[in-house]
Every structure is written in structure tokens, then in C-alpha cells.
């Protein structure tokens, strides 16, 4: 039985994180996953920037938008007036000013060799916000989903 435990442990490590396309890695809070996916104060080339996201999900994400702003500034949008989200919930908030962002779109490749094109944009955004979890920053609400770009 002693030999089985190391083998089981090895299998768990090699299996790695596997999550569906619509889910976030369960070891992260939704706000932390939002930050990983969408907050990038200084623009990076899409192929490099998407590695971090794709390594969590173990697949090439088809499209992703990076907001070139701080988590603190995006979280401040959660204090603005609530509006209806695409999913009909009432926890969305629109930015009061446009921000620089990069839209990354998958052009070719299979994980881990994902290749992306980039489009720089200067637009408003809408985020869904929820109360923070224990390990989140201590804001009243934190961004958990990028609902749309305007």
C-alpha cells in the first residue's frame, strides 16, 4: 500500500488542472481569475500574454480582451450604477471613461502552441461584480466577469 500512495500522487500532479471552457480554475477566486484573464496594466504581445491563461485551462482560448488598467481602477467601476448584464442579472457596471485594451484572437495552433492576432482598442467596458471572497482584495464589490466592450 505504501507504494500506491506515491503513484497516486504522481498521477494527480501529471493530470494537472482541467476545467471546462466556461469555468474558472477552482483554486482561484472569480476575482483573481478575472484579474489573470483581463487585467494587464502594460500591454504584452498576445502570444505571450495568453500563455498564462491557457496554462490554467490546458487549451487555446479563442478570444480574450486585456484591459490596460489596474485591478484597483477596474474594481472602482463596480461602485458605479448597476445595469443589466447579458445574462439578465443586475450586477453589471459600465466604465465612465474608455480605456486602452487589446483584443487577442486565436489564429492557429493547438495547445500549447497557440498563436494570436492582436487589435488595440480604446473603448468603454462593462463588468459583472460580486462581493469579494476571503482572499480577494477588501473592496465592497470586485469584478468577476468582462461582460462586454462598447
From Swiss-Prot:
Where along the chain is substrate bound? 61-65, 86, 105
The positions annotated as site (Facilitates cleavage of polynucleotide substrates) read 59
Sugar-bearing residue positions: 55, 100
EC number(s) per entry: 3.1.27.-
- Which compartment or compartments is the protein found in? Secreted; Lysosome; Cytoplasmic granule
Which GO terms are recorded in the biological process aspect for this UniProt protein? antibacterial humoral response; antimicrobial humoral immune response mediated by antimicrobial peptide; defense response to Gram-negative bacterium; defense response to Gram-positive bacterium; innate immune response
Query: Which Pfam family is one of this chain's hits?
Result: RnaseA
Checking Gene3D superfamilies in the record gives: Ribonuclease A-like domain
Q: Subunit structure of this entry?
A: Interacts (via N-terminus) with bacterial lipopolysaccharide (LPS).
Quote the function comment for this protein: Ribonuclease which shows a preference for the pyrimidines uridine and cytosine. Has potent antibacterial activity against a range of Gram-positive and Gram-negative bacteria, including P.aeruginosa, A.baumanii, M.luteus, S.aureus, E.faecalis, E.faecium, S.saprophyticus and E.coli. Causes loss of bacterial membrane integrity, and also promotes agglutination of Gram-negative bacteria. Probably contributes to urinary tract sterility. Bactericidal activity is independent of RNase activity.
Say which family it is in: Belongs to the pancreatic ribonuclease family.
Protein name according to UniProt? Ribonuclease K6
| Species of the source | Gorilla gorilla gorilla (Western lowland gorilla)
Question: From which lineage does this chain's organism come?
Answer: Eukaryota, Metazoa, Chordata, Craniata, Vertebrata
